[in-house]
Amino acid sequence: MFIQSETLEDAAKVAEIERIVAMMIADIYKNLLAYYAKLATAKGIDWREAKKIVDAFDVEMFQMQAKAYVENKDFSDKANKELKRYNTAMYANREKLLKHELGLIVTKGYAEQENVVNHHLQETVTRTLRHQAGILGADVHVKPTDVEAIVYSNFGKLNWSERLWNNQDELRKDVERMASHVMLRGRHPYEFVPEIRKKQKQTVANTKRLLITEAARVQTEAQKLHYLETMGDDAEYEFVAKRDEKTSKICRHYDKKVFKVKDMVPGVNAPPMHPHCRSTTVPHVGNWRDKFFKDRQGKYSVEYDKVLQKSAKDEMTDALDSGR
């Protein structure tokens, strides 16, 4: 079934997000430990003085890493703009350098998450159009610019990329606060392990919610495009909720309800109705069949027309049942 296959696709991307976030958090903790160790082993130097001394080698390594990230052509313009901030920064002391190193790690982690979400949403649009073509027997040729427009449409006041980078800003501020505690108060990074683990779970949850919810939105946008192109302005669609113990009240309420395609709006009368929404839509069968037979009326003898109607009806039913 289409809903189940899309759920599996979502799960695969969530696993990739979990890996990226785990590596990002591990790098953050590793850098905190490394800086704490350097301060703890500074011989003959007062703690307050040690934290001010910037190792030229550390700066050089950081600049090389920042430059390498900026030159990554896979990242978006927004990601590269964020990364360039670290490539041109000045470093007055160890605390500032540490904050920039951690900020670079966080930014790179979110750039990689953005890539995963972007590719998943584009693939979701393509799969949805292919699925609709299997049901209705008609392809819609969509330009890459149309796919991109669907993927980056606003849902509410912001699009998914803007929401993702807002989440990055929040995590970066939290990490910088931890860095200040390590550098200014000499607190061991181990004290922050519970908080770091909490941030890891929260980061995964935020991106997962964004990915699944936006996947439902682009499915709806792609379905609407296909319905209008193949069935016309008077076409209708049926809201289909995934029925189980997790199904929300609002999706249960809308399940099996029929609406005009021209009035189709995600979050209003089409998925997603809420975060993590798993509902979808299908063309309204009764409406489609009526049009299907009306277009062919009078083209055949009465006897043959009856045979044709039965054959066509059986063919459509099989296609809908099999999800082709």
Give residue ranges: language-model regions.
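Short, basic interhelical loop/turn and adjoining N-cap
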Residues: K199-N206
